[in-house]
Structure formats: structure tokens, C-alpha cells
UniProtKB/Swiss-Prot annotation:
The keyword Zinc does not apply. Its EC number is 2.1.1.173, 2.1.1.264. PROSITE patterns: THUMP, UPF0020. GO terms for molecular function: 23S rRNA (guanine(2445)-N(2))-methyltransferase activity; RNA binding; rRNA (guanine-N7-)-methyltransferase activity. Belongs to the methyltransferase superfamily. RlmKL family. The gene is rlmL. It comes from the Bacteria. It catalyses: guanosine(2445) in 23S rRNA + S-adenosyl-L-methionine = N(2)-methylguanosine(2445) in 23S rRNA + S-adenosyl-L-homocysteine + H(+); guanosine(2069) in 23S rRNA + S-adenosyl-L-methionine = N(2)-methylguanosine(2069) in 23S rRNA + S-adenosyl-L-homocysteine + H(+). This is Ribosomal RNA large subunit methyltransferase K/L.
């Protein structure tokens, strides 16, 4: 009797142990991410050929205590390696596990490699060569809690690589995951008609057809780990292959189950057909190109098992929520008598189905933890509807009614105002209703939703549910394409993590504001390149700039500088610490046809630059951050703590008769007026002049001050 370990993703252990028992294994013991078992050689081969759930099969040679590098070396050295593989074969070592003296897996692998090479040499054999990528013979070592297990990778390449897949789609589903879905859903036991309306490259349907036809999952594989194992019994292995071929031939003739697969992407459907043909089951599966929301129900009852798109796969969160909401409608309307099983990593998407799960299971898709939910749609609760009547957006009659009504009201009022004002970007909603704690900004025909951090006492599930309601109801409330909704999360940043890139892709637009043009980037950063609440402040800067020298400190993307230049400034100096924002400011100037030597752009720490510059200005706009601890700054900056010292430095740059417009976004900011007046400044609050109509609901969004020479 030989000892083996069947490795598998976490969560597969119980189902795998049942599969091993059914195949005839003994002494079965579940472990973390796998199952130990015993079997004679012939059964070890059979399990390698027939296991649908295992990732790999390891033939265990040694298992024992390991508390030091010396013990690890001795354990590996004690194995009679020349009886396992030839020194003419290349080998590699896969080492798993950390802890104790094992600080990294490379160290463990190197120790075992040294022991193997030394053992060959000490037995008067020339040493075999190491080949990391494509070795003939792979050794597997697993270290856990002071114990080392050393074995031979009996199965070779990962067992989910069945050999029938040609190429993959954007988000391929591993074959053993598909098999686990079929087992855990109950389909494998019932073996009824099966539909996958998001079939992609066909993995779920192909695995199901192979199960139904008694086709061994390893029958199409060309390589196994035991190919270069010296005790390999080729005769026994060939007999098992012959048996598997015979069973497959009989199984295909007896299979009466119907399989249906569709996908909206014709390229994926073509790929699924090629994969099914490679697997020998193409004639059993009815593939078609179609939208899951409009397909006809192919049979009266059966199983629908699918892996629809989710956040990590192929989609925008808003359009995905719309999709799941519509899917729920489709299932309830037309799939009476069906069992439905859905794999997804986002419980909010699953909740958008509005179906009660009979069972919820955890199942990993690679490193991604997913929920695998099972539903039963009862026939008496369904109705047949025309596909054209499936809702395109969420029905605001039963979700987020107060939010939807408020958005509609705001939109009706602000859209007319914006056109009259000469702007096409504005704030549509700003946490008007406390339970819907988001800001909604409209940029042309796009919407950016910023989710504020909820108070700690509100459960995360509640905030997610409310955000889902917002995303589902917004498209119909204002008539916007769900794909034009962008979601961002704004929260208190910690450490050095302040304004960082969010995603690699860009979505750039050009917006117009009182005749000025600005570039927006809606996706790449938390902020879009234009602070909408400062719209009137920028306009004021432009109105005060004619015939004056202007300086814009903490300039961000230079939008106030553009207004100054368009307003007739004799010179404009734009200063910011970020190269990215300085370059962005230059782009904004170019957009407005502003190309002149009188426009200067300075990349510098503004606080330091103010101290060393010899330039003087007639108008200075300064809009510092509330707080900053950027790596480029020697010390942190806090606007309330440091504004007196900062404004003292700014005041020194001001020409007689000049003006400073100082603004910041710190709520409950307290201006040290007496300390500033003592330095000869005249201070006037101008909040009422700089708060746009779309921010009247949030009067504390910023505070603005006009500073001049006293007297």
C-alpha cells in the first residue's frame, strides 16, 4: 500500500474525500487544502486519471518531524533517490509552507536540492541537473507545524489542465472548480438537463458532459508526473487508459441529458465549441450566441449553473448590478421548476438577484474567495413574459424611493441652471439624505459617485445595501447609461496614502466652465482634475485678474490659473509639488489656446518656494490641502495649525494694493484673524460669494477669505 496526498483548493476537502472513497481509496484523512489517502499503485494511477477535483496527486515518500535545516537536509538525503529517477532526467522542487526556520520557500527547496545532489554523488552517480520551468521529474515538499512531507508529483502538471482547452477567455474558470460546482450543486447526483447562459469558453458544460458520459478527466492529458518515475508500470497504466476509452465510448452512446450553453460574445462561443470538440463532447452541447436576459428557456425544468461576470471579471460595477437585477427578474419570470446555482465574489451582486438562497457555500476561484449560492425557483411563483419587458433598470418603486425622488428633483432643477450658467459639470447630490451617504457629480453624460465612509456603528452590510440601491436606481432616475456611472470610495487616508492612482485605465473628457475648457480624468485618480465646489472661486479669480500679475499656489491642475489667463492677467505663475498636476495644468492652458512666456509653471514645495522666491504679485490664489504628509515634504502640514505662518509668507509676496484669495476645505476651520491682523492684514470672509448653487446643500464644503493690506 502506498501513501498519497491529493492537493486541492481550500474548501474542496470534503467533496474530494468523498470522491476518493468512491474511487476506492482507503485511510482517507482530510487536511488543509487536500486529503491524505492510501492506495496500491494501480489505484493511485486510477485516481490520477479519474479525479475531477484534485489539483495534483503527490506520492508521499517521507513524512516526519523537521525542526532545523539539518533535519530537513537529512530527511531528503535519507531517501534512495536513484531508485526514484534517473540522473539523466532533469528535476525541480516545489516547496510549500513557511514557519520556524523556513523563512522563505526558496531556502527549503535549496536544502532539499543539495541533499538530493549529494546523495547521488555519494552513491557514485553523476548528479542530475535542475530545470525549474519544465523538469522531467518534480519533487513536492510541504512544511507545516514542524513537520515535513516529501513526495513525488505523481500527476505532473496541474490536474485541472485536462488537455482539451485551446485558449481561454478573459476570465477562465478552472476545470476542477467547474467540477466542484457541479458536485456541490447536486447536479452530479441528479444529472438532469443543464444550462449555462454565461458559458464563456464552455468549461462548466464540458465538465458536466464528461461526467454524464463517464469520460475520465485525465484522458486527454499528454503528460503525467510518473512518466519519468523509475518504478512506473507502463503496462498497468495503458490498461487503465484502454478501460477509460471503452467507458467513454459506451457513456456517450447512453447519455440522454441535454446541455445548453450561450454567451453574448461570439468569439467565446466559437472557443467553447473548439474546447468541446477537443474533449469529444461537442455533439452533446447546444451552443449559441445570445444575451442571457433574452434567451428562451430551453426545457421545462433543469439546472442552471453559471459563473456570471462580477467585479474581478469583465465589468463595471454599476452595469453589473443592473445585469443581476435583470437576471433575478428573468429567473423569477421564466425559470419556474429550475434549480439555479451561481458563483460570485460579490454578495451585493447576488443580493441584487432578489432570490432567497436555499444554500450558501464558500468556494475559491483561484485566490478569490467566492460565494456559491443555490436557489430553487418554484413554478407557481413564475410567469411567462416577453423578453422585451425585462426591466432595463431597477424598479425604483421598491428600492431607494427617497433617494430616487431626491435625485430626480435635483436633476430637474440643476440641469436647467447649469445650461444657463454655462457649465456642463456639477454636483447633483451630496448626502442630502443621511442614509444614502454619497456624492453624485455629473460630468457631461457621465456620473461619478463618491461613497463617503460610513460611521463605524453602521454595519457594512447596510452600507453596501444602500450603495447597491443607489447604483441600481440612478440610471432610470436621470436617464443615464449604466456604463457611464463610475464609483469611487472616499475615506480618511492614513500614513502617506493620500491622492494615489486608482486604476490603470483612463477616461478623459473635456468640460466647459464659463468659457474655459478643462481636461477631466474620471477613473485614474480619486479626484477628477476639477474641484467643482471652487467653480465660483475660479470665476472670481478670473474677474480680478485683468491687468494684474497672478500666482496660483497649491495649483492642482491649474484651473484657476486658466481663468486668470483668460481674464487678462499680465502674467500667471502656477506652482504645485506634483509633476503630474503641473503637466496637467500645461495641458489645460494648451486646451484654451494659452501659449505665452508670461505663463510660468513651477514644480516645487509651495511652502518652501514662497520663502525663497523674489517675485511679487498683484493677486494670489492659495488653496492648500487640509492635511499633507507627502514624501516630498520634510514635515507634515495642517491648515488650521499652520495657516498663520503660511499666510505670513504669502503676504510678503503681495504687491501694494494686491489681494490674496485664501480657501480651504477644512470643516469648522477657525481663522486666526487677530494674529493675521497684527501683521497688517485686512481679513474678510467671502463664503457667500464662492458657494455655487449645486453646493448650497453643503455650506461647509469650503471656506474662503479675501486678504488685503490693512488701511
Amino acid at each position: 500500500m502506498l501513501n498519497f496526498f491529493a492537493a486541492a483548493p481550500r474548501g474542496y476537502e470534503y467533496a474530494l474525500s468523498l470522491e476518493l472513497a468512491e474511487l476506492g481509496a482507503s485511510e482517507i484523512k482530510e487536511s488543509v487544502a487536500g486529503v491524505y489517502f492510501s492506495a496500491p499503485l494501480e489505484l493511485g494511477y486510477r485516481i490520477t486519471l479519474w479525479s475531477r477535483l484534485a489539483s495534483r496527486i503527490i506520492f508521499v515518500i517521507y513524512k516526519g518531524p523537521c525542526e532545523s535545516p539539518e533535519q530537513l537536509y537529512n530527511a531528503a538525503y535519507g531517501i534512495d533517490w536513484q531508485m526514484q529517477f534517473s540522473n539523466r532526467s532533469t528535476f525541480s522542487i516545489d516547496f510549500h509552507g513557511l514557519g520556524g526556520f523556513i523563512k522563505n520557500t526558496q531556502f527549503g527547496a535549496l536544502k532539499i536540492k543539495d541533499a538530493i545532489v549529494d546523495r547521488f554523488r555519494d552513491d557514485d552517480f553523476s548528479r542530475p541537473n535542475v530545470e525549474r520551468v519544465d523538469a522531467d521529474f518534480r519533487i513536492d515538499a510541504h512544511f507545516r507545524r514542524g513537520e515535513i512531507t516529501i513526495g513525488i508529483n505523481f500527476s505532473g502538471p496541474a490536474l485541472h489542465k485536462r488537455g482539451y482547452r485551446s485558449t481561454t477567455g478573459e476570465a477562465p474558470l478552472k476545470e476542477n472548480l467547474a467540477a466542484n460546482m457541479l458536485v456541490r450543486s447536486g447536479w452530479q447526483a441528479d444529472k438532469v438537463d443543464l444550462l449555462d447562459p454565461f458559458c464563456g469558453s464552455g468549461t462548466i458544460l464540458i465538465e458536466a458532459a464528461m461526467m454524464a458520459c463517464d469520460i475520465a478527466p485525465g484522458i486527454h492529458r499528454e503528460r503525467f508526473g510518473f512518466d519519468h518515475w523509475l518504478p512506473h508500470n507502463k503496462k498497468v497504466w495503458q490498461e487503465l487508459l484502454n478501460e477509460a476509452q471503452a467507458r467513454a465510448s459506451i457513456g456517450k452512446t447512453r447519455c440522454e441529458i441535454k446541455f445548453f450553453g450561450s454567451d453574448i460574445d461570439s468569439r467565446l462561443v466559437a472557443l467553447a465549441k473548439r474546447n468541446a470538440e477537443n474533449a469529444g463532447v461537442l455533439e452533446l452541447i447546444d451552443f449559441s450566441v445570445g444575451n442571457a436576459l433574452t434567451i428562451d428557456v430551453p426545457v421545462e425544468s433543469g439546472f442552471l449553473i453559471s459563473n456570471p461576470p462580477y467585479g474581478e471579471r469583465l465589468g463595471n460595477v454599476t452595469s453589473l448590478l443592473q445585469l443581476y437585477y435583470q437576471l433575478g427578474d428573468k429567473f423569477k419570470a421564466e425559470f419556474g421548476g429550475w434549480s439555479i446555482a451561481i458563483l460570485n465574489s460579490d454578495i451585493e451582486l447576488l443580493s441584487a438577484l432578489k432570490l432567497k438562497a436555499d444554500k450558501q457555500m464558500k468556494m475559491n476561484n483561484g485566490a478569490l474567495e467566492c460565494a456559491f449560492n443555490l436557489y430553487t425557483v418554484h413554478a407557481e411563483n413564475t410567469r411567462r413574459v416577453d423578453p422585451a419587458n425585462i426591466k432595463i433598470e431597477g424598479d425604483v418603486s421598491d428600492i431607494a424611493v427617497p433617494f430616487a425622488n431626491r435625485i430626480k428633483k435635483n436633476f430637474k432643477q440643476l440641469e436647467k441652471w447649469a445650461k444657463k450658467e454655462g457649465i456642463d459639470s456639477y454636483r447633483l447630490y451630496d448626502a442630502d439624505l443621511p442614509e444614502y451617504n454619497v456624492a453624485v457629480d455629473k460630468y457631461l453624460d457621465y456620473v461619478v459617485i463618491q461613497e463617503y465612509s460610513a460611521p463605524s456603528q453602521i454595519p457594512e452590510a447596510v452600507t453596501k445595501r444602500r450603495l447597491t440601491d443607489v447604483l441600481i436606481s440612478l440610471p432610470s432616475a436621470i436617464g443615464i447609461d449604466p456604463n457611464h456611472i463610475i464609483l469611487k470610495t472616499r475615506e480618511r487616508k492614513k500614513g502617506t496614502n493620500q491622492y494615489e492612482k486608482l486604476v490603470a485605465n483612463k477616461l478623459e473628457l473635456i468640460t466647459t466652465e464659463y468659457g474655459a475648457k478643462f481636461k477631466l480624468n474620471l477613473k485614474e485618480y480619486l479626484d477628477t482634475g476639477l474641484f467643482l465646489d471652487h467653480r465660483l472661486t475660479r470665476k472670481l479669480v478670473g474677474e480680478k485678474s485683468k491687468g494684474r500679475s497672478v500666482c496660483n499656489l497649491f495649483s492642482y491642475t491649474g484651473s484657476a490659473s486658466v481663468h486668470a489667463a483668460l481674464g487678462g492677467a499680465t502674467s500667471v505663475t502656477t506652482v504645485d509639488m506634483s509633476n503630474t498636476y503641473i503637466d496637467w495644468a500645461k495641458e489645460n492652458f494648451a486646451l484654451n489656446g494659452l501659449n505665452s512666456d508670461k505663463y510660468q509653471f513651477v514644480q516645487a514645495n509651495c511652502l518652501q518656494w514662497m520663502k525663497r522666491t523674489h517675485d511679487r504679485f498683484d493677486l494670489i490664489f492659495i488653496d492648500p490641502p487640509t492635511f499633507s504628509n507627502s514624501k516630498r515634504m520634510e514635515d507634515s502640514f495642517d491648515v488650521e495649525r499652520d495657516h498663520v505662518a503660511m499666510l505670513s509668507d504669502v503676504f510678503k509676496l503681495l504687491n501694494p494694493g494686491g489681494e490674496i484669495i485664501f480657501s480651504n476645505n477644512k470643516r469648522k476651520f477657525k481663522m486666526e484673524i487677530a494674529a493675521l491682523e497684527a501683521q497688517g492684514m485686512s481679513i474678510k470672509n467671502i463664503d457667500n460669494q464662492t458657494l455655487p448653487l449645486d453646493f448650497k446643500r453643503n455650506p461647509h464644503i469650503h471656506n474662503t477669505w479675501l486678504i488685503t493690506h490693512a488701511g
